[in-house]
Every structure is written in C-alpha cells, then in structure tokens.
Amino acid sequence: MAKKIQAYIKLQVKAGQANPSPPVGPALGQHGVNIMEFCKAFNAKTQGMEPGLPTPVIITVYSDRSFTFETKSTPASVLLKKAAGLTSGSARPNTVKVGTVTRAQLEEIAKTKQADLTAADLDAAVRTIAGSARSMGLNVEGV
C-alpha cells in the first residue's frame, strides 16, 4: 500500500548550499522531517549544478515523516539576469530597457529549462523565454 501524503512543501534553495537555517529548517521542522537528512540529500543531488543558483524543490512529506523531493530547473528570470549581466530587471519594462540578450543566449536558457516548460519544441521554448525577457525589460535580438 502507498504511503499517505501529509504535505507538499515548495522551496527555492541555492544549489549545493542547503542548510538547517531559514527557510529550510522551519519549513521542514513543522512537518517533523529530518532536516539534516534533506540537506545532505539535496546538496548531493545539486552537486553538478552551478553553486548558488536558486533551485526550486518540491518536497513530499509522508505521514511516517519520511520524504521525497524533486528539483526543478533554475527560474528563467535568474538565468536571464545572469545572461544579461544584471542584478535586477526593469521597474518599468515597457519604457525602460536595462539590457540585451541574443537568440543564442535564449536558446541556451531554453535547453536548460525545456524539461520544465510545456513547449512542444526548442523554438517554442525560445519564444517563451523571449517573452519572459521582454517582461523584465530586456531587449531581445534575433527573435
């Protein structure tokens, strides 16, 4: 028989840098999950990723206090800011442009994100990422 699910916890944790301090500790502690066990497993799973990139994770907590987790790819906005060399997007994206990204950069980001996007092919994924870039106040070249 399958285990009974007690809760789903959604967090963004920096790749390879999970530790018991907030936000990880309190979120897992209130469900009785072994925090250090999660931190070790998460850090091991994200070892191949670039350290420090925020990584969304969905933790499924079961009634016997065991857990499983699934990591997603880094948010597109973070990857776009990194590609454009910015710290934040534009406060007024339609009037003030703060940077530029090329089609090659968009394709690289789309390849990274394609597993988490609903796009049918790479070109559709590039257009989705280009829309995110425009909504952040970035000029998009070649799309």
Swiss-Prot record:
Name of the coding gene: rplK
Self-association and partners: Part of the ribosomal stalk of the 50S ribosomal subunit. Interacts with L10 and the large rRNA to form the base of the stalk. L10 forms an elongated spine to which L12 dimers bind in a sequential fashion forming a multimeric L10(L12)X complex.
Name of this protein: Large ribosomal subunit protein uL11
Claim: Lipoprotein is one of the keywords in the record: no
UniProt xrefs under Pfam families: Ribosomal_L11, Ribosomal_L11_N
PTM note: One or more lysine residues are methylated.
Purpose of the protein: Forms part of the ribosomal stalk which helps the ribosome interact with GTP-bound translation factors.
Organism: Ectopseudomonas mendocina (strain ymp) (Pseudomonas mendocina)
Sorted UniProt keywords: Methylation, Ribonucleoprotein, Ribosomal protein, RNA-binding, rRNA-binding
GO MF: large ribosomal subunit rRNA binding; structural constituent of ribosome
UniProt cross-references to PANTHER family, sorted A to Z: 60S RIBOSOMAL PROTEIN L12, LARGE RIBOSOMAL SUBUNIT PROTEIN UL11M
Family listed: Belongs to the universal ribosomal protein uL11 family.
GO CC term (a single one): cytosolic large ribosomal subunit
GO terms classed as biological process: translation
KW Kinase (keyword) present: no
